């Protein structure tokens, strides 16, 4: 479910990204389970000249207690859409954990290539993710 929040837009891109990820990890305002584990923090971010953002998270991103295909889809889709939809200068993202590119968070979604909002429609495609 899409949720709107107001964050200050000033400052460095890395700081603004960190604020967005912190809000995402805080969970929905209406209650419910956060899309990413609450201990998730963005350690570093780098934007290349072509609009690819490299996002380096702490191990908290891998800390899902009951990993499954939907939980992983929700986490990755939420990260991608939160970043790409709110930062026009970012077209795609790559997810890293502790400075290392990860193949997948829990074995379900391939993270070896850059991801964009086009990869994650607002609702899962019928019959799978």
Spans of model-derived segments:
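Bimodal "functional hotspot" detector
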Residues: 1-129
């Amino acid at each position: 479910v899409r949720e709107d929040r107001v964050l200050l837009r000033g400052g460095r891109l890395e700081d603004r990204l960190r604020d967005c990820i912190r809000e995402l990890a805080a969970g929905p305002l209406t209650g419910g389970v956060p899309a990413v584990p609450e201990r998730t923090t963005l350690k570093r971010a780098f934007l290349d000249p072509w609009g690819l953002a490299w996002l380096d998270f702490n191990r908290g991103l891998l800390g899902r207690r009951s990993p499954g295909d939907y939980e992983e889809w929700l986490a990755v889709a939420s990260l991608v859409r939160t970043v790409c939809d709110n930062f026009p200068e970012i077209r795609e993202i790559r997810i890293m954990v502790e400075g290392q590119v990860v193949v997948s968070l829990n074995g379900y979604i391939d993270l070896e290539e850059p991801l964009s909002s086009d990869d994650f429609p607002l609702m899962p495609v019928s019959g799978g993710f």
